């Protein structure tokens, strides 16, 4: 009898140390820590970065410069809005604008919707749906188009992937509107679409290191605010 009890105790101890027992507990622990949102996002084919850290007024110099450059903006997109704090911030800087926040992470959107108001709304990041808005006066993409890898950057996040998403975002900007891309792995200025925009200067702000298209060479980022040039009408003569 004593041997049977001892064997049962040992079996229970081994079970508690097994993956079958520990894996669900580890997943639940990560959910409580907020790390589950990173897992959900990383499994999405259009995910560009894992961490979803955000805060109110996270980039005050950039927001102020953009507001000065587009004081009459009526519709603004926060691409990769995370849990919504950026949208609240933009609503303060652009008092006359409707703010649309979008994210691919449904858990982020659940948290973001507590910030909904008459001027702030949140939607799932469907390209087709965003195209249906008819353009934006400003598109903000802050710390989204990036990888946090420090080695083999081109392998984990090639420049072509960045350029493809940058092309989509710039297609949403109305002529005369702003495209704001900050804390990205690469520079918008190295894409072919750069020549249809002019640079808006920004007061001194924190600049993160970026890479050239080879994904190896580190370089200094340029200004992160760009104004889409209006088409030039050619005279018939």
Regions found by a protein language model. Give the residues of each.
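A short acidic, Gly/Pro-enriched loop at the edge of an enzyme's catalytic core
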Residues: 128-143
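Conserved Class I S-adenosyl-L-methionine
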Residues: 189-219
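Conserved SAM-binding loop of SAM-dependent methyltransferases across substrates and taxa
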Residues: 83-96
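Conserved SAM-binding motif I beta-strand of class I
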Residues: 98-103
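Conserved SAM-binding strand-loop segment of SAM-dependent methyltransferases
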Residues: 117-127
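Conserved SAM-binding loop
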Residues: 112-113
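A short glycine-rich, Lys/Arg-flanked "PGG" loop and its adjoining helix->strand segment in the class I
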Residues: 155-178
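Class I SAM-dependent methyltransferase Rossmann-like catalytic core
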Residues: 31-72
């Amino acid at each position: 009898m004593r041997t049977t009890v001892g064997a049962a105790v040992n079996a229970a101890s081994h079970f508690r140390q097994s993956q079958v027992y520990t894996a669900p507990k580890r997943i639940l622990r990560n959910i409580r820590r907020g790390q589950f949102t990173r897992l959900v996002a990383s499994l999405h084919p259009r995910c560009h970065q894992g961490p979803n850290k955000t805060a109110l007024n996270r980039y005050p110099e950039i927001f102020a410069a953009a507001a000065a450059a587009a004081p009459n903006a009526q519709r603004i997109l926060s691409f990769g809005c995370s849990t919504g704090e950026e949208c609240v911030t933009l609503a303060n800087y652009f008092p006359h604008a409707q703010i649309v926040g979008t994210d691919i992470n449904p858990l982020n959107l659940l948290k973001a919707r507590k910030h909904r108001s008459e001027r702030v709304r949140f939607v799932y990041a469907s390209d087709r749906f965003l195209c249906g808005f008819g353009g934006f006066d400003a598109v903000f993409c802050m710390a989204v188009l990036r990888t946090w890898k420090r080695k083999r950057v081109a392998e984990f996040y090639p420049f072509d992937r960045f350029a493809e998403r940058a092309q989509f975002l710039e297609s949403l900007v109305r002529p005369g509107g702003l495209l704001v891309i900050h804390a990205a792995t690469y520079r918008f200025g190295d894409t072919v679409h750069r020549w249809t925009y002019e640079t808006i200067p920004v007061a001194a702000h924190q600049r993160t290191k970026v890479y050239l298209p080879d994904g190896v060479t580190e370089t200094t980022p340029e200004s992160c605010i760009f104004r889409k040039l209006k088409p030039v009408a050619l005279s018939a003569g």
